[in-house]
């Protein structure tokens, strides 16, 4: 039976993050968001992900892609 749903895939990289919505039927891209990976720099110069900012960006991208998808989103993959 054909799978007429969509999946959202989250790719968190050290430079950029991509959140993409694909058709599960034929892997067609239904939408995508790309943004710079948020980072924090400590006074000592250590660099780490800014988890709160990153989470807000990912949540916003998921919400926008879900709302715009012509297919119901039933899966999220990281």
Where are each of the predicted segments found?
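N-terminal glycine/serine-rich phosphate-binding loop of ATP-dependent small-molecule kinases
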Residues: 1-78
């Amino acid at each position: 039976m054909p799978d007429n749903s969509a999946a959202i895939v989250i790719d968190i990289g050290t430079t950029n993050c991509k959140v993409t919505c694909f058709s599960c039927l034929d892997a067609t891209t239904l939408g995508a968001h790309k943004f710079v990976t948020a980072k924090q720099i400590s006074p000592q110069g250590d660099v780490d992900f800014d988890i709160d900012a990153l989470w807000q960006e990912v949540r916003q991208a998921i919400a926008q892609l879900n709302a715009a998808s012509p297919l119901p989103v039933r899966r999220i993959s990281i």
